[in-house]
């Protein structure tokens, strides 16, 4: 059962409570390239991104935040480190959320300046704890970025904001070690009702990043923990969005768009099952229907598994049995089984 947290409004998206899990990504174009950032932001929006983060190293870079915000219709988050004036500048241009670690932007007066700016414009702050950049005194206490150290860091930063009567807060507590990350989120969720941004940081190359994020993010969602997610990949941010939705779909959350399932095939397969499944998935890109499509390799397990889908085929030599809503309908034969199958899918 999902652990319900307080609601936080980020632009036109609300997270927490019973609201859907929001999928995020972050632009990776150099901040000086405003045109490139705008173009990438539009691609992310088209891919289904619901919350978009953009780095802002200095106050002067707020012009990139402003340009991106004016170009898309999804909330923009400014990623701030060290320079509190960058946070103030982003608040001035109407950013929808600010991600900081209050402990690394200076003394209490600077933290209060950021809090006051966000308070005046109802801008939430995400406290983004990372296992690779914990405070020295916390690392000295625990010796490593163990879950307890990460939770202590997060709560330390929360108290800094709460000291100034600010509670429009989201928290993340990321680590590249999946078991540590998961235990940290468990411990944090048990002691706070602020909504949680879930992710695995520095997850590695594309393939390993997918695996670690699937395990870490998916595992947390299955335990009811998480209000928004970001899949960190060494890839284009659109791929992160796609992966985020696939994780949500895999753990049972309703996601607009088709899900294509297929068997791994074996020596019994007598038709190009894998090629057909890949082509079906390609042709259905952009489809918003929430349907499950099965492409199965043979008549052993295929019919039973295809029956679990909205529509599916179980193949044999030069033919495939078509199933619709669990019932066998007819055989598809000839050289154009794929085209026949797509016609049936489009009828749903």
Model-found features: residue ranges?
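N-terminal amphipathic alpha-helix/helix-capping segment at the start of soluble metabolic enzymes
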Residues: 1-26, 119, 282
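Active-site mouth loops of central-metabolism enzymes
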Residues: 18-36, 55, 74-82, 138-151, ...
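Hydrophobic faces of well-ordered beta-strands that scaffold small-molecule active sites
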Residues: 21-27, 52-54, 76-80, 98-100, ...
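Glycine-rich, proline-tolerant flexible connector loops at the mouths of alpha/beta enzymes
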Residues: 34, 45-69, 99-107, 169-178
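Alpha-helix-loop-beta-strand connector modules within alpha/beta enzyme cores
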Residues: 59-80, 113-125, 185-196, 280-284
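Glycine-enriched alpha-helix->loop->beta-strand junction motifs that scaffold or abut catalytic
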Residues: 71-74, 92-98, 119-122, 189-195, ...
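Hydrophobic or amphipathic alpha-helical targeting/insertion segments
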Residues: 85-126
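Catalytic alpha/beta core domains of metabolic enzymes, predominantly
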Residues: 129-133, 138-285
């Amino acid at each position: 059962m999902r652990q319900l947290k307080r609601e936080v409004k980020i632009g036109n998206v609300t997270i927490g409570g019973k609201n859907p899990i929001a999928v995020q990504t972050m632009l990776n174009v150099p901040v000086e390239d405003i045109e490139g950032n705008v173009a990438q932001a539009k691609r992310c929006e088209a891919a289904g991104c619901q919350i978009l983060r953009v780095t802002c190293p200095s106050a002067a870079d707020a012009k990139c935040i402003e340009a991106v915000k004016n170009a898309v219709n999804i909330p923009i988050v400014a990623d701030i480190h060290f320079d509190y004036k960058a946070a103030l500048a982003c608040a001035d241009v109407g950013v929808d959320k600010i991600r900081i670690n209050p402990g690394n932007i200076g003394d209490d007066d600077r933290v209060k300046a950021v809090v006051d700016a966000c308070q005046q414009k109802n801008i939430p702050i995400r406290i983004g704890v990372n296992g690779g950049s914990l405070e020295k005194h916390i690392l000295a206490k625990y010796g490593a970025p163990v879950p307890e150290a990460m939770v202590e860091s997060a709560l330390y930063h929360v108290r800094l904001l709460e000291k100034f009567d600010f509670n429009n807060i989201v928290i993340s507590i990321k680590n590249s070690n999946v078991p540590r990350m998961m235990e940290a989120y468990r411990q944090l969720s048990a002691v706070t009702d602020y909504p949680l941004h879930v992710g695995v940081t520095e997850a590695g190359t594309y393939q390993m990043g997918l695996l670690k994020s699937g395990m870490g993010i998916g595992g947390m969602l299955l335990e009811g923990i998480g209000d928004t997610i970001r899949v960190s990949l060494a890839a284009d941010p659109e791929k992160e969005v796609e992966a985020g939705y696939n994780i949500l779909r895999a753990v049972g959350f309703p996601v607009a768009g088709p899900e294509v399932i297929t068997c791994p095939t074996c020596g019994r397969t007598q038709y190009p099952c894998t090629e057909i499944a890949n082509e079906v998935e390609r042709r259905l890109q952009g489809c918003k229907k929430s349907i499950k499509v099965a492409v199965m390799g043979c008549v052993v397990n295929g019919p039973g598994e295809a029956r679990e889908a909205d529509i599916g085929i179980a193949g044999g030599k030069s033919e495939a049995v078509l199933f619709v809503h669990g019932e066998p309908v007819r055989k598809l034969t000839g050289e154009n089984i794929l085209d026949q199958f797509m016609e049936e899918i489009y009828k749903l």
